[in-house]
């Protein structure tokens, strides 16, 4: 598991938070995330790699119905709750 400082550094990025918001609801393909968030698929892949390294998301290989190489679909790996009290 990622320590608190690493988790906060990962979550400070708005695009990563938007990705997680969608993955909490249901697994998504990178192209779906790119279309919903309004950033390139390449940028989504960069953020997914960071989220995967931080153990926020997991990648699953899904076979295609009509042949071809399998596709990757991403889902939230674990629940996370951060509560910060000031004062």
Show where each model-derived region lies.
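Short helix-coil-helix linker/hinge
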Residues: 9-16
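Alpha-helical residues within the helix-turn-helix
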Residues: 35, 52-53
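Conserved segment of winged-helix/HTH DNA-binding domains
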Residues: 65-87
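Key DNA-contact positions within bacterial/archaeal DNA-binding proteins
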Residues: 42
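Beta-hairpin "wing" of winged helix-turn-helix
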Residues: 54-68
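Short capping segments at the starts of secondary-structure elements
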Residues: 14, 25-32
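Short, Lys/Arg-enriched N-terminal segment that forms or immediately precedes the first helix
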Residues: 1-9
């Amino acid at each position: 598991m990622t320590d608190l400082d690493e988790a906060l550094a990962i979550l400070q990025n708005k695009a990563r938070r938007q990705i997680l918001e969608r993955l909490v609801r249901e697994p998504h393909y990178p192209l779906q995330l790119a279309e919903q968030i309004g950033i390139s698929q390449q940028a989504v892949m960069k953020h997914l790699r960071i989220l995967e390294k931080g153990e926020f998301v997991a990648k699953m290989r899904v076979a295609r119905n009509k042949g071809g190489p399998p596709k990757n679909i991403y889902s939230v790996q674990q629940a996370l709750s951060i509560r910060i009290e000031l004062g």
